[in-house]
Amino acid sequence: MLLKQIFLPFFVLFNAINAIDIYQNQVSRGTIDLSIGAITIHSGAYWSIIDNAISALVGTLTVQQDAGFYITGLNPLLGLQVELLGVLNSIKNDGIVSFNGLNSLVGPIYNLVGLSFQNNGEFYLSASGVAPPVFSITAADWHNNGLLVLAQAKRTSALANLGFPTGSIENQGSICLFGTAYQQLTSITGSGCISADRDSTIYIFSSLLPIATTQTLYLADRASSIVIQPVTLPATYTVRGFGNGNKVGISLPLLSVPLLGQPAYSYDPSSGVLTLRGLGVGLLSQRFQIGTGYDSSLLEIVTDDGAGLPTTLLGSVRYNGPVPNNAVPASCNCKYVPPSPGTDESSSLSSSTSEQSSSSATSVSASETSDTSSTQESSLSSEVSSTQEPSSSTPEPSSSSETSSTQESSSTEGPSSSTDSSTEASSSESSTAPSSSAEASSSTESSTEEPSSSTEGPSSSQESSSSEESSTQEPSSSTKESSSTEGPSSTEESSSTEGPSSSTDSSTDITSASSTDEQSSSGTGQSSTEDEPIDSTESDTSSATDSSTATDSSATNTDTNSESTDSSTATDTSSTDSNTASSTETNTDVTDSSTDSNTGATESSTATDTNTDATDSSTVSETGATDSSTATDTNTGATESSTDSNTGATDSSTATDTNTSATNTDTNTGSNTATNTDDNTATDTSSTETNTATNTDGTETNTGTTETNTDTSASNTDDNTGSNTATNTGGTDTNTDTNTGGTDTNTGTNTGGTDTKTGTNTATGTNTGATETNTATNTNGNGTNTNTGATDTATNTATGTNTNTGATDTNTNTNTGATVTNTATNTGDVSATKDIPSPTSTDEGSNNGGGSNNGSGSNNGSGNGSGSGSGSGNGSGDGSNNGSGNGSDNGSGSGNGSDNGSGSGSGSDNGSGSGSGSGSGSGNGSGSGSDNGSGSGNGSGSGSGSGSGSDNGSGSGSNNGSGNGSGNGSGSGSDNGSGNGSGSGSGSGSGNGSGNGSGSGSGSGSGNGSGSNNNNGSGSGSGSGNGQDNGIITSSIGQPGSSTSTQGPSSSNSATIPEQANSGNHIKFTLFNGLLIGLVPIVFM
């Protein structure tokens, strides 16, 4: 208390310094800061704030008698937020306070928390109901002596809160609910009225907080209800207006248990009390004093499933008869939300603007029509005034704000997509008045209509502009009659617009025969309330010169495309081009796009078949001396991807050229032969066929196109009588893609321009004669195309059949003349047989082959690299000191040394004495036997082990170990043998084999060579040689022959055995090594 006494003077002083006082009418728009102190609206004045998103009141709000304070949101995307959060602030209203969010698509927040709330005037909180709002007026000291309205245009799950929870409020006036559920959280005193109207609910949440029986709960319509939670002892509530199907109930099911409980409900006709018993138990019952005169047989148990309420199955009772006493209680004086100052003025302004535009036939700009959005709220409020209760003392002024702003578009050249959006907010009248050239004036008057308001019938008289092909167009006038109870609706008139508009393609070609379009359209808007017809007749003498199409010197060819039925009655003024072509493009199945992509054969298949669901937009427009016959037959559909992806060795060449539709016969029966040869002058540049139709003295010869169009200047016969075969010769695209050879990946995507056949068939015919505009837009095939030119007979009697029956479009992609880029990526293994010349050794792969014919090249060791050649398999060759490989110091295995046997030779007369151990020494060959391999026979044995030693060759020399030196490749070295060393041990020698390559070739030679110093030694190495550039070194040194090597995935390196391998030093060194190795066993025996 002491703190309050200290703080309160400072607070009052602060508010007095920063107070806002309004003495005269004021309208503020846009953002404004209200958090500056107390606000007082003095008598005779109002303050209307429009489109201020956040209004934070930090001081006391006082509205005096005959004053008003309004906060309104006209912008539908703006959510109002009005807050009073000062605990010492208060609200006192003796005039009108209205927080109006009926136009907002965002739920407004009205959170008024203060020390006290006293309403002696009218207080309105409203929302559109698109999103749940917040209705909360919380104060410890809460009094309503006037009118408090909580309104939603559409009910949501939001629950209104009045007073401080568990506290008390006094209601001596009227609390009126429109489309709103009120949740009682306080006790209620006073003798006022709480009215539920337009699908509203009074929800008594806690009967622990009593409601005085002098407080009347009124059900104003059949959709409203009362629900009480029966958690305490039964109480009695005064209810009026019960009947016509509205409901009273509790939050427990109304059941009657036979023999145990009481009936679910009972009505006492003498006292007028209706008792509802939850679960048939008396303690869970509530009593409703509904009045006398009710018939119990008309009572029925139902379920109240209103939004925001706990759904209780069979918890309510309705009365299926009229209210016996239908008088509205005297304390229930309800009104709907009034219009806010500053909004009704804008609505009347826009209404007068649209009315003026409808009478003077001027084109209302978009800025004027956009101003109609500001009238929605006012017209909505005026609508509610027409439906208020009969006993309302103050009828709401119905500001005739039904602003149907009339768009009258004067004749507009070119595409005019002017959207005549006449927004009418009062009732949901969607007046769609398209202008004659399909000016889509969808004036969607999306008003938020409260229930039981007068509905305006949307009489949208659409003015179908079927523009006749004569030189003078007179569209029929459209009469829009909207029977509205709101006010005078303005006249909508849309004058006929020349040129293509957004929806109807009425392209009128105005030529030198001056066509005068005189649209005399009179629109009559009639108001059912005023009973005062408003006629305004406009004669729009707009000679709309549509210079959008051809300026024909003597012909006026007007093609009118009304929706999809291409009536195209192109009446040429002096040239009689009567195109009787019914051009029946029958797409019986899929609309085949026939996109043949041929790289090379540029298939300028001009005759572009537009088979888009049989929409042959064959706009053959011969403008001036330019016969721009854009017969756009665009076979859109079946895209024929022609993938041709041959992956692997399979030549999968799928050349998908799928043309899975009909045969694309393109028969176009007419003399319009259009033999689409590859010599087609119609240069299909990026699918644009220039169809040069040279009209020399009337003979329009479409060279290369699907259209001959024989136009003669004087009597321009243009005789399209025939079959319009459109044979597409040259673009046949068989695309057989015979990938002869390897894997032939043939990823040939036929990149020839996708051949979408969108060739626009421009047909630039020179047509030196009369100018035939022939805009034949054959939609669905029945285009009449009567071009009455100079004498320009142009008898296109073609049935232009374009019969894409099933769209099979075989289109085999023959690629005749096309360059198929067969990319042929050989992904798999390829086995190739190669003839290797005599002095060349091919070192390929890691697989070792055996040289069967071992040449006796001089001093060549053909052994391989670092693998040790401990051939355990011994060559059983005999003969003393015979190498099976001949030549001076040649090894036959992979290269021979001098006197070396290619296999493992035996020592002095030893057979297969191959050392089982791997030959040691730096670079060892796996040879065995001193005095190697037997005589004249060949030691063809190959050691099974791989030759050891770094960089060893497998060559055998006479009396050599397999001694390979370090650093030997598997090539040929001088004086090396890849042969085998001495008999029983593995021969070691420092002699080097000339074999290069780090791979080792270890052949164990089991074959015996006999004979003295022959040039054979067919040692074959069975081991694998690996290392640098490993592989079988096949040397055809001795006998030239062909060696077949199996090639793996690795690269092939051709190693040429050098001629320098025959040097004398190597021969000597090899002989010395052989003798040394042969003597070692003798010494140690």
Curated annotation (Swiss-Prot):
Region of interest: Disordered: 339-1060
Q: Where is the signal peptide?
A: 1-19
Domain of life where this protein originates: Eukaryota
Which chain regions cross the lipid bilayer?
A: none
Could you give one GO CC term from the UniProt record? fungal-type cell wall
Biased composition range(s): Acidic residues? 529-538
Tell me, using the record's free text, what induces this protein. Answer: Opaque-specific transcript. Repressed by HAP43 and induced by macrophages.
Q: Where in the cell is it found?
A: Secreted, Cell wall; Membrane
Q: What are the Low complexity biased-composition ranges?
A: 342-528, 539-828, 1031-1052
Q: Where is the lipid attached (GPI-anchor amidated asparagine)?
A: N1062
Name the glycosylated positions.
659, 782, 854, 860, 864, 874, 882, 886, 890, 896, 900, 910, 924, 932, 938, 952, 960, 964, 968, 976, 980, 992, 996, 1008, 1016
Name the propeptide positions: 1063-1085
Task: Give the free-text PTM comment from the record.
Answer: The GPI-anchor is attached to the protein in the endoplasmic reticulum and serves to target the protein to the cell surface. There, the glucosamine-inositol phospholipid moiety is cleaved off and the GPI-modified mannoprotein is covalently attached via its lipidless GPI glycan remnant to the 1,6-beta-glucan of the outer cell wall layer.
Q: Which Pfam families match?
A: Hyphal_reg_CWP (PF11765)
Specify residue ranges for compositional bias: Gly residues. Answer: 847-1010, 1018-1028
Mind listing the UniProt keywords for this protein, alphabetically? Cell wall, Glycoprotein, GPI-anchor, Lipoprotein, Membrane, Secreted, Signal, Virulence
What is the protein's known function? Answer: GPI-anchored cell wall protein involved in cell wall organization, hyphal growth, as well as in host-fungal interaction and virulence.
The family assignment reads: Belongs to the HYR1/IFF family.
Q: What is the name of this protein?
A: Cell wall protein IFF6
Organism (species): Candida albicans (strain SC5314 / ATCC MYA-2876)
